[in-house]
């Protein structure tokens, strides 16, 4: 998982361990499952980033604050980064982890992610039903789904991602009776931003590697980006270091990064994109039928509880295929479509 991949010795940024989920269909049908062991962690992103920075500084990384990079250009065998105030930084290899906008990546000719959803989230005092389970509300907005993630016994993050106007969709979702009656006070934090889905065809250029949100390395089934971003960052660091030692910053040399990260993450991201498209094509009635079908199949629920993997969902999809009955033929077709 993401915590193991981070290799951070301090885990004080972990707010909550998650073992299960309650999935709601548009019509109110509900599917519950809960594993014996934690399957995900809720983290304070600011504390997580701080822990990562502290670890990097201890390893000798030089960090410059308040130094936004305006432009990148190539001069011979070096990349030149233009910093605000007229300063410049020269490097043989640059790793861009600049987030969803990916301005430097675009300047270098790297295409943007396939799709960028509009996301919005608030943290509020909330009547949490089960602090070890998240809530997933299907059909709340076209794009992904809405979520309720407990951060404490009586606080939760409520958010969603939509094709557009995420804030408007979230406002409507917060006004729904099933959510509104459980909100116990005003929002303590509000976050808005883009969620990139679908990596571009190439994530390298001469002297440049792109990682994380800028490269669309986000799980389309959950919207999580920490795990794939960490995996890709390690690969990028290794390839960049080797290329710099060789004095070869060509796009052809750096293509090794593209090959390795796609071998590790590419299939799961492709399956996730197909699953996302499939979910968005389903009508409210079809979502109701799907959730109702799963809720009435204890063997399938047990399979989900035993084999669910938020980082690599394809393994669960394959196992579910072996436990479907005749009434699950439609679900079998959907799973086969997602698996490709």
Residue map of PLM features:
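N-terminal FAD cofactor-binding segment of flavoenzymes
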Residues: 1-22
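A short, compositionally biased micro-patch
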Residues: 16, 26, 75, 84, ...
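Conserved N-terminal helical subregion
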Residues: 16-17, 22-107, 114-119
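A short, flexible beta-alpha/helix-coil linker loop
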Residues: 30, 38, 154-156, 215-218
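FAD/FMN-dependent oxidoreductases across multiple families
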Residues: 71, 88, 164-245, 251
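Conserved FAD-binding catalytic core of PHBH/FMO-like flavoproteins
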Residues: 100-175
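C-terminal helical "tail/cap" subdomain of flavin- and related membrane-associated enzymes
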Residues: 241-340
């Amino acid at each position: 998982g993401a915590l193991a991949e981070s290799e951070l010795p301090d885990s004080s940024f972990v707010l909550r361990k998650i073992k299960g989920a309650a999935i709601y269909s548009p019509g109110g049908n509900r599917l519950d499952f809960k594993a014996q062991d934690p399957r995900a962690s809720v983290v304070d992103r600011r504390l997580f980033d701080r822990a990562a920075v502290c670890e990097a500084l201890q390893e000798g990384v030089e960090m410059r604050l308040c130094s936004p990079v305006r432009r990148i250009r190539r001069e011979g065998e070096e990349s030149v980064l233009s910093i605000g105030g007229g300063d410049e930084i020269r490097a043989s290899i640059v790793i861009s982890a600049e987030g969803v906008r990916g301005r430097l990546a675009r300047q270098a000719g790297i295409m943007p992610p396939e799709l960028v959803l509009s996301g919005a989230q608030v943290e509020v005092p909330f009547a949490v039903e089960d602090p070890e389970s998240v809530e997933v509300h299907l059909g709340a907005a076209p794009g992904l789904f809405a979520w309720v993630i407990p951060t404490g016994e009586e606080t939760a993050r409520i958010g969603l991602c939509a094709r557009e106007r995420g804030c408007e969709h979230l406002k409507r979702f917060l006004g729904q009776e099933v959510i509104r009656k459980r909100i116990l006070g005003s929002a303590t934090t509000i976050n808005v931003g883009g969620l990139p889905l679908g990596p571009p065809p190439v994530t390298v250029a001469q002297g440049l590697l792109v990682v994380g949100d800028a490269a669309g390395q986000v799980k389309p089934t959950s919207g999580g980006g920490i795990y794939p971003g960490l995996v890709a960052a390690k690969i990028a660091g290794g390839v960049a270091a080797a290329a710099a030692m060789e004095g070869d910053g060509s796009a052809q040399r750096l293509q090794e990064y593209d090959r390795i990260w796609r071998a590790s993450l590419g299939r799961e991201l492709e399956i996730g994109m197909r699953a996302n498209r499939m979910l968005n094509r389903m009508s409210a009635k079809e979502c109701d039928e799907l959730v109702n079908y799963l809720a009435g199949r204890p063997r399938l629920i047990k399979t989900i509880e035993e084999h669910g993997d938020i980082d690599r969902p394809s393994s669960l999809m394959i196992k579910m295929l072996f436990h479907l009955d005749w009434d699950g033929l439609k679900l079998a077709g959907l799973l086969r479509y997602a698996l490709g």
